[in-house]
Amino acid sequence: MDTLHHRFQQFQKTIWFNIFCYLWTGIFSFLAFAPVSLTHFVWIAPFGFFWLSLKYHGKYKKLFFHGLLIGVVFYAISFHWIIHMAITFGNFPYVVAILILLFAGLLFGLKFPIFMMSFSFLSGKIGRHSVWVAGFCGLLSELIGPQLFPWYWGNLAAGNIILAQNAEITGVYGISFLVFIVSYTLFQSNPWHWKEIIHSKEKRKQYLRFITLPALLLLTFIVSGIFLFKKWENVKPVKSLNVLIVQPDAPLSFRDGREIKESIEALMARIEKLTDEGAVRLGKKPDLIVLPEAGVPFFSAHKTEITTKVRRMYWDRFDSLMFLLANRYKANVFFNEIDAGFKGAPSPRNLRYYNNNVLYDPNGDRRDSYQKKFLLMFGEYMPFDFLYELSQQTGRFEPGLTHNLIRYYTPRYYTLAEKEKSPKGRHLGWTDTETFNHEAVRSYYETTRTEVSETGKFLPLICYEVILPEFVREFRTAGNPEFIVNLTNDKWYGATTESDQHMELGRLRSIELRRWMVRSTNSGISANIDHLGRFVGNKKTGLMTAEALSETIDVIDSPPTFYTQYGNLIPWLMLFLTGIYYLNLLIGIRRGKSA
């Protein structure tokens, strides 16, 4: 063991050791993250930080440099899909796509050098508190480090369903704090010290004192997680809804040699077929049919002066199909479209586009809509106008103005005959919309109209918004939703790990709010997630597939959770109080030296 230790010490002096540290943290972080989800590796992944912080202790420029390199390696391994996105979405050459990945690692991996420099500084000044310094610096880097695709160390640990329950109280940041505390404790418990700990009574006492508080913290999180899991597992739902998710695998563009009409016709027929097949598997009429973001790309079902004359985006056959699905099953249909409006006085310069979700009630009437508020930089807008010339496929979207919930409805029947009422002859289908205009389609179903009543409200999120815990909290001003619906289009990333990561990052919102989530994606991964963060029925759709997912979801009636009301209060409070404590210690140390 001593010989091995000596060799490792010699290895630490080489540049190869630095590369070893980059790869250690990058690889073990990837293995702990979705889709591999070997969560236990998260506890040793930060070792690379600790090794380099010891090697370059007090050398802040080198720590900053090596922290940046860890960020680049982490991004290259875990977020390699950025290359695919840059090529597919931005139409950039392969070399430029690689440069974009490297730039993303440098810019959005800043939390790594922030951790290493702050940890080196504080642990050098306050050595006996190093384990808590690790937690403090880890939390600090998570809270202030800039990110485009926000992920946190707590997300990696939240693959453990018990630890994940603590997100209701501490948010993901609290779990990140735990990760760094436990990781540094394990780091200092390495095999090199076992011999002296075993043979020395004094060393054993020191070690027990060292691990006592971290062990108690871990135990607290485990006990709290078990308590919260049992508490919410025993909560009885107030009602259930039959939900049908349609994953149509719509094309990103029409560049495969077929006519646009042929491609879009095939897509609309596929949506109708998937809905019918999903309803058959459900065995009863759905209450809610959910289509994904860009499930019908490039078009709008909103007939306005702007979408019909200024920009011809409205397509009556799109409008008709959504109307037909609502009436065929007397269900709510929630779907995505492109909408447009003027920002200020009507003029070409003031024309704006919106990523819009809208609900049609069981009569096919247009009801509430939600316009995406948190837009993705480089995807839905560019920070500077000249960048549009480099990526002409990037959208020019305007953020929505409100955090609003979506109301959904239930048809009210007063007699059996009224419930079984059907249109004259037969139900219309997609092919009929070629000969029936939208007004004719509505007229055809006029006799089947029924009274509907508002049943409840749900929280709508579009794509990227679901991975932003602070943003999702802002909907609390709109009321207490019954469940969450997330519409997403991840097709830009191909069959990469991004879809699994997107799903995993969004899963914690169900725990934070204690609400079930319906997640409908264009090309995968679609699923229903319960209020404990579990996949309902252990069902998920595949990637790059067209399929439907039918499931009954539960509605939990409970007041807003601690996290919903207070957000990251506990992590910020921990950071503030610990910071005050360390500042006081540093001042005391400085005064002691001057005396």
Swiss-Prot record:
Belongs to the CN hydrolase family. Apolipoprotein N-acyltransferase subfamily. The keyword ATP-binding does not apply. Pathway: Protein modification; lipoprotein biosynthesis (N-acyl transfer). The active site is at residues 293, 372, 463. This is Apolipoprotein N-acyltransferase 2. The gene is lnt2. GO terms for molecular function: N-acyltransferase activity. CDD domains: ALP_N-acyl_transferase. It comes from the Bacteria. Gene3D superfamilies: Carbon-nitrogen hydrolase (3.60.110.10). Its EC number is 2.3.1.269. The chain crosses the membrane at residues 30-50, 63-83, 95-115, 167-187, 210-230, 569-589. Catalyzes the phospholipid dependent N-acylation of the N-terminal cysteine of apolipoprotein, the last step in lipoprotein maturation. GO terms for biological process: lipoprotein biosynthetic process. Residues 241-555 form the CN hydrolase domain. It is a multi-pass membrane protein. It is found in: Cell inner membrane. GO terms for cellular component: plasma membrane. Keywords: Acyltransferase, Cell inner membrane, Cell membrane, Membrane, Transferase, Transmembrane, Transmembrane helix. It holds the Pfam family CN_hydrolase.
